[in-house]
Amino acid sequence: MEEEEVLEVVEDEKAGPAAAEKRGPTDTLGSAPAASGHYELPWVEKYRPLKLCEVVGNEDTVSRLEVFAKEGNVPNIIIAGPPGTGKTTSILCLARALLGPALKDAVLELNASNDRGIDVVRNKIKMFAQQKVTLPKGRHKIIILDEADSMTDGAQQALRRTMEIYSKTTRFALACNASDKIIEPIQSRCAVLRYTKLTDSQILARLLKIVEKEDVPYTDDGLEAIIFTAQGDMRQALNNLQSTYSGFGFINSENVFKVCDEPHPLLVKEMIQHCINANIDEAYKILAHLWRLGYSPEDVIGNIFRVCKTFQMPEYLKLEFIKEIGYTHMKIAEGVNSLLQMAGLLARLCQKTAAPAAS
């Protein structure tokens, strides 16, 4: 690649979605190099919401952020929730709504999993909080700490004092997966908002919009497979969609599972059906096949549980199956992750449905 092209790609990455829109549609689709010689923007970035009203899911929590944006007086906030649910995006949308053109000068964004030590609080954060920035009346500078639960205890202790000292000029917005890893003194200084995983229907609605805009050929079972592999994570869903389209040019379940490479739910479904029929030999053949393909016990047991939840079977039997799957998952998580454990699970599932032996 020419040096000029390398510089252009680096500048585009720094500029973000706004620069992508200026370059035009031919430069921003997909993930492989286009004929024009430009690299294409990941769809996760291209379709990242710019306004709070565009954020998918968690309507109640997002509506609270919209109230903050409208009134202008934002408290320090912590947004906690699983990955890919829009925590950082929501904070950026809030900052954009509050600060408008001053966004570039008045926002400091740090990823706390990299900048996690006490030096960052003492240097970067403190220096930014001390800077004088001209802002509209009633607005504050915003410091965004992504993955704040990765910060060391020492850094968090130093941060709480900084939050108090600069409370007149600066607001802190923390995004984390688990709020219990944030120390109590910081939690008490913040409004804690919680995000949940997105529902299948919410992910499907956004996927349909994107495949329409990008003119992606797809089948219904292909989108179902993407939703199944995403597990409520919108980022994962968009990455899987783009990877499948870039690799195969067509979205169907077969192509999706080639890209995502996890135990195929149809195979798992067939295995559960054999267990319901008390056919241990056929069930074990499928398990041995999955094992030979190199899937870890965590992958297999996770998919067995997810398929079992939606499997059509008597309710009492489903409860028994899920109980046994849970016990086996616990043993695997503790490190006893052999094929024998998985085979034992199949034997116990078959035992639940087998006719009692004649006395």
Curated annotation (Swiss-Prot):
Main localization category: nucleus
For binding ATP, which residues are annotated in this chain's numbering? 81-88
Sequence ranges of Basic and acidic residues compositional bias: 12-25
Listed A to Z, the keywords are: ATP-binding, DNA replication, Nucleotide-binding, Nucleus
List the SUPFAM superfamilies: P-loop containing nucleoside triphosphate hydrolases (SSF52540), post-AAA+ oligomerization domain-like (SSF48019)
Tell me the segments the record calls region Disordered: 1-35
**A single GO cellular-component term on record:** nucleus
Work out whether the entry's keyword set contains Membrane. Answer: no
Q: A single GO BP annotation from the record? A: DNA-templated DNA replication
Highest taxon listed in the record's lineage: Eukaryota
Which Pfam families does the UniProt entry name for this protein?
A: AAA, Rep_fac_C
**UniProt keyword Nucleus, yes or no:** yes
Q: Where in the cell is it found?
A: Nucleus
Biased region (Acidic residues) positions are 1-11
**MF GO annotations:** ATP binding; ATP hydrolysis activity; DNA binding
NCBIfam families per UniProt? PRK00440.1 (NF001679)
Q: Which family does it belong to?
A: Belongs to the activator 1 small subunits family.
Which function does this protein serve?
A: Subunit of the replication factor C (RFC) complex which acts during elongation of primed DNA templates by DNA polymerases delta and epsilon, and is necessary for ATP-dependent loading of proliferating cell nuclear antigen (PCNA) onto primed DNA. This subunit binds ATP.
Q: How does it assemble?
A: Subunit of the RFC complex, an heteropentameric complex consisting of a large subunit RFC1 and four small subunits RFC2, RFC3, RFC4 and RFC5; the RFC complex interacts with PCNA. Forms an heterotetrameric complex with RFC3, RFC4 and RFC5; this complex has ATPase activity but is not stimulated by PCNA. The heterotetramer of subunits RFC2, RFC3, RFC4 and RFC5 interacts with RAD17.
The record's annotation in PANTHER family points to:
REPLICATION FACTOR C / DNA POLYMERASE III GAMMA-TAU SUBUNIT, REPLICATION FACTOR C SUBUNIT 2
Which protein, by its recorded name, is this? Replication factor C subunit 2
Question: Quick one: which gene encodes this?
Answer: RFC2
